[in-house]
Amino acid sequence: MGKIIGIDLGTTNSCLAIMDGKTAKVIENAEGHRTTPSVVAYTDSGEILVGQAAKRQAVTNPDNTFFAIKRLIGRKYDDKAVQEDIKKKVPYAVIKADNGDAWVATKEGKKMAPPQVSAEVLRKMKKTAEDYLGEPVTEAVITVPAYFNDSQRQATKDAGKIAGLEVKRIINEPTAAALAYGVDSKKGEQTVAVYDLGGGTFDISIIEIADVDGDNQIEVLSTNGDTFLGGEDFDLALMNYLIDEFKKEQGIDLHNDKLALQRVREAAEKAKVELSSAQQTDVNLPYITADATGPKHLNIKVTRAKFESLVSDLVMRSLEPCKKALEDAGLSKSDITEVLLVGGQTRMPLVQEKVKEFFGKEPRKDVNPDEAVAVGAAIQGGVLAGDVKDVLLLDVTPLSLGIETMGGVMTKLIERNTTIPTKKSQVFSTAEDNQPAVTIHVLQGEREMASANKSLGRFDLADIPPAPRGMPQIEVTFDIDANGILNVSAKDKATGKEQNIVIKSSSGLSEEDIEKMVQDAEANAEADKKFHDLVTARNTADNLIHSSRKAIQELGDKVTAAEKEKIEEACKELEAATKSDDKQAIEAKTKALEEAFAPIAQKAYAEQAQAAGAQGGAKAEEPKKEEDVVDADFEDVEDDKK
């Protein structure tokens, strides 16, 4: 059985970890970084860039560079959040798919589902793991925000499938962080608050870590959050301030210039990071735009105090879910023994200060906020693979689940913060005399009114024998698996007839859609390989042309005019071939140049060897002088000093 890798698929950055023996290890990507930007770009040449390479070219390719895709995953286009919070904040096109989902489109009109874009990031993670392990990787544990609903969880599983990964478990991010902390800590019973403020989402989980018969039992008592609160919002607040200040100075609104907007966005993110350690920073963007009077430059000084005033409402927004999580767990602030900070945005001093004020204790600084979630996912992978024996994880469902009943009311079968996996049944009946069928409308949320909650799906139980209203007994069963994904069945107790629905297409993608996307991903992998091979052939050709011409120059009169002409002709033909996309032609002309140059190289080598032999013979006659020999001191260098 291969390794089950752990992936933190983040809004802004993603991270990969694996179990290395008994410990989880974060794996660096091909660029040598421990986290990878969750950015995917489609270039004019048809190449797909992922991570740092995609982020670097975002300024010049804003329409086709997709970031913060996690905020769209599993969402409908008409969602208030999509219309208000996303469409206005990104330079790329967000469109309505045929099934009503929020999709994205390139400027060339290629439409893509968010899981399809996220799959590119997962493919890079998969490749990183395979390069490190030297073997194929097909299984993963992927983390999601604790407050993700069923559709968002399913869409994340779909992204894994498109990337060629079987998602063995979907695990909540704060739970994963507690797992990373809990496995390392051997301090007996603890009640831990995990405050997770990432790039796009915020979660708070209250978790109990206990030693039960020598096993680390990690039980989630409650969870709460906001799927539209994260570092991206902090960047945006600073970006809007910079644009407003520039408008005051120059009278030009940069909101309408996509290129300038992307430059300001990047500068805002950089300034935000700098202000976590410095009291002030300069945002300097020369030639940001131009008008009739000439080019304009943006140069604005931002102090930490100014930035904190811009985002203080965002930080305060995170404290309300903290109150609710404590209430749901039936605990007070004094019951919390440790506070863990997770997510890059928790590096901001104001966040740390407000969390300390709220819980009345100093948050721990020994947990890496960028890596803890991936480490926890890898540990869960180790548990599932049987490599980690002494850990028991008890997670919860973040939102209540139920069905619509008479009068448009939601009747809850499973309350929020119920430990999963779980199964619950309840008997319902008909609303009319001789009603032949009932529609089971499955809902997720906390509101009394059915229409105010998230609809997960509908199905009908038909052929109910004629009977007065209230007589037939329809047993509805909700079954949630360990991923937090739901199965619902309805059974007529009189006839035994049963109908069920696996809430699996609530991500909006059918099996056929996913299969097509898997094939597209494989085709892209093939195209990427062809592109890579073509570039390699061109590089080989360029090196050969350079070395051949240099050698001819160095050999001078030792090469005849006819030989020089033959080599130059072969070089020119190869140069012409490298300008095409025909790999075979490049390789054929490369071979032709190699063959043309081979006799010259042999002749030069023979002459060189002959000259060296003659020189060596002359030197052999000279006696060696003893004083030329020096004794050197050698020192053993231990591995840890290397």
Swiss-Prot record:
It comes from the Bacteria. This is Chaperone protein DnaK. The gene is dnaK. Belongs to the heat shock protein 70 family. It holds the Pfam family HSP70. Residues 628-642 have a biased composition (Acidic residues). One of its GO terms (molecular function) is ATP binding. Induction: By stress conditions e.g. heat shock. The modification Phosphothreonine is found at residue 201. Acts as a chaperone. Coiled coil: none annotated. NCBIfam families: PRK00290.1 (NF001413), PRK05183.1 (NF003520), prok_dnaK (TIGR02350). It comes from Francisella tularensis subsp. novicida (strain U112). Keywords: ATP-binding, Chaperone, Nucleotide-binding, Phosphoprotein, Stress response.
